[in-house]
Amino acid sequence: MKYYIIAGEASGDLHGANLIKSIKAKDSKASFRFWGGDLMQQQTQGLVKHYRDLAFMGFIEVLFNLRTIFRNISICKKDITAFQPDVIIFIDYPGFNLRIAKWAKKEGFKTHYYISPQIWAWKEGRIKDIKADVDAMYVILPFEKDFYQDKHNFPVHFVGHPLIDAIDNREQTNKEAFAKLHGLDQRPIIALLPGSRKQEISKMLRIMLSITNNFDSYQFVIAGAPSQDASFYAPFLNKQNIHLLLNKTYDLLSVSHAAIVTSGTATLETALFKVPQVVCYKGNAISVAIARQVVKLKYISLVNLILDKEVVTELIQGDFNTQRLIKELTKILDKDNRVSLLKSYDALEQKLGGIGASDATGQLIVDALK
């Protein structure tokens, strides 16, 4: 069978790679075309566009890049038409993917969606498009099944969270060998995860790095995004006690004592590695003001959303400043606070289900094509 997969972000590349691996194991004649990244490319040939050329975040940033976005939509439609896949698999990235899904459904292609758009947070009206244009939906958060089936009468498959697979499949990291390899000393590590896009990394790192002199007994390591080169981070490395590791986020989290994390998938990854964290976000002021009007959520981090309570502190916009960050980081370095936080992480993992999300999704997709 021929599979066309569209992932527009780093997290989608990770989950897309594991999904491709699963499909290949079940369909020996599988061939692929995809929009994604390096991890998907390691699994198969057929990269059309890399996600680093697709990722625009925030209302204002999208407006400034509309011409590029529409050009990419046109390229995608033409490539799908030329490839004639048996199924198109969309991975999150709703602004782009739902446009393609509407077109693809009219053209007679099978449309499957892995990792639901977060319409339970905002743009719930998109449910009409999803019901009309998506043949099968595979959800990864426990409350999403109830949202779709009970509230909107749209059957979906809850497959568990693929991050559990990704973490379970990785090779274990030896802490001493890791430190030696990357020129680190024996002090506990505080990981800095500033995001994957240039615009957010610059904003986040400026404040994250402002606190390092207050924590001399720790060493700070920036998790460099796979979509960025070392040269991009160079201006941020002019202080002592700051290190950079490119494309080694899981290895870094596995040996970290605490983390400061930009809101997004990384908050859940950090929790699954059982690393106490402070969640932060600072975006374009206009974009954030608009988002606050339309997003109907109590929290921004997946950890708090899934557990439906504030487990990790969230510092957003003006609250994300040097003084608050020092205060909140000090809290999670306290032994008693850490014990309580780690217990909540255990409850989180139980809610997400066990391993096998990628495998289950691959099986459902292959079976649907028989």
Q: Model-flagged regions — what are they?
A:
Residues M1-K370:
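Nucleotide-activated sugar donor-binding and catalytic core shared by glycosyltransferases
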